[in-house]
Design a protein with these regions (language model features):
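Bacterial N-terminal signal peptides that target proteins for export
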Residues: 2-15
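Mature extracytoplasmic/luminal segments of secretory-pathway proteins
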Residues: 2-5, 21, 239
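Bacterial N-terminal signal peptides
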Residues: 12-24
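Sec/Tat signal peptide C-region and signal peptidase I cleavage site
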Residues: 25-29
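Extracytoplasmic/lumenal domain signature
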Residues: 30-336
């Protein structure tokens, strides 16, 4: 049962609030030191910001594209906001919502961008390319896979870039776009890889498996669930790996691949989890609910919205949890 306060806001279209969930700093050498440089904020996918949360959101502006926006934005050092759209374009807009430039690809852009320390912006497209753009929209380089790229790139401290593709492979490429290695799975990879402090890479696959890889491309372990793993993993400070599956279960694994605990929501989980500074985990489910768990798997609270929750939560420095629902509302939860 939910104990404290909740605020929600109607979201009938793609609307950008200047929420502090996008205001953070990077802890990784090759990732830009910007407010929100990549999908889920950092390589461990905590979804957590060190900046304070707002008490009363004010709509500052709306930017209209020609297609749905499922790509999550990244924020550059100068405040530029980068994101993709299903209109085949990748956008750069100013902090006050004005268009700087739009880069056209040959496919929908659902991949969320990552910004490198040198300012290079990385993102994938359904045209099978991973693009590296300069800040003026010129192409630094591009890498071609054999399938569409929805997975969001992760930039390791050594500069290696990891991402999944519809070609059923996890790709590891150098910082100048050259192939290092691939790991073949039995189905598409939508899940965005998370990277542990020791360099281990974790990602889910459409073949129902969670994979753990070494930086040099050797498999550490894999675990089979009963359905798709399109959500992206979260890595806890103690090394545990947290991920939801479309088999309706939320899994927490130890770093050696052993299951620590699970929770059955009775409906698919596409939401990628977030973790607060106390180790509590938050995620949404197709059963319309948002869940909060303690690090050892005890249910703290749950809250039922008006529709399924595939949105991934983000957390402000004051602990406020932000998450959207298909009921067209953005919710802000008191952590207690």
């Amino acid at each position: 049962m939910f104990k404290k306060s909740v605020t929600y806001f109607g979201l009938p279209a793609f609307i950008l609030f200047l929420l502090p969930i996008f205001l953070s700093t990077s802890l990784y050498a090759q990732v830009a030191d910007t407010p929100w440089p990549m999908f889920r904020h950092d390589l461990q996918h905590t979804g957590r910001s060190p900046y304070g949360s707002i008490q009363k959101p004010i709509l500052k502006w709306v930017f209209q594209t020609q297609g749905p926006v499922t790509s999550s934005p990244a924020i550059g050092e100068d405040g530029t906001i980068y994101f993709g759209s299903k209109d085949n374009k990748f956008y750069a807009i100013t902090r006050d919502g004005k268009l700087k430039w739009a880069f056209e690809t040959q496919g929908e852009v659902e991949s969320s961008p990552a910004i490198r320390k040198d300012g290079t912006i990385l993102f994938g497209s359904w045209d099978s390319h991973l693009y590296a753009l300069n800040a003026d929209s010129s192409i630094h380089w591009k890498y071609k896979s054999e399938g569409g790229i929805i997975s969001s790139p992760a930039i390791a401290p050594d500069g290696t870039i990891y991402f999944g593709s519809w070609d059923k492979k996890l790709h590891a490429i150098t910082q100048d776009g050259k192939l290092k290695w691939t790991q073949k799975t039995a189905d598409h990879i939508v899940s965005s890889p998370a990277i542990a402090p020791d360099g281990s890479i974790y990602f889910g696959s459409g073949d129902y498996y969670l994979f753990a890889m070494k930086p040099e491309g050797k498999a550490i372990w894999s675990f089979g669930t009963r359905y798709l793993l399109d959500a992206s993993p979260l890595i806890a400070p103690n090394g545990n790996i947290c991920i939801g599956s479309e088999d309706a279960k939320f899994y927490v694994f130890r770093s050696d691949g052993q299951v620590e605990w699970t929770f059955d929501t009775l409906y698919d989980i596409d939401s990628s989890a977030a973790m607060d500074t106390h180790g509590n985990v938050y995620f949404g489910s197709g059963n319309n609910s948002i869940y909060a768990f303690t690090p050892d798997g005890k249910l703290r609270w749950s809250f039922e919205t008006g529709a399924s929750v595939s949105s991934s939560p983000a957390i402000g420095a004051d602990g406020t949890i932000y998450v959207g629902s298909r009921d067209k509302k953005l919710y802000a939860f008191n952590p207690d």
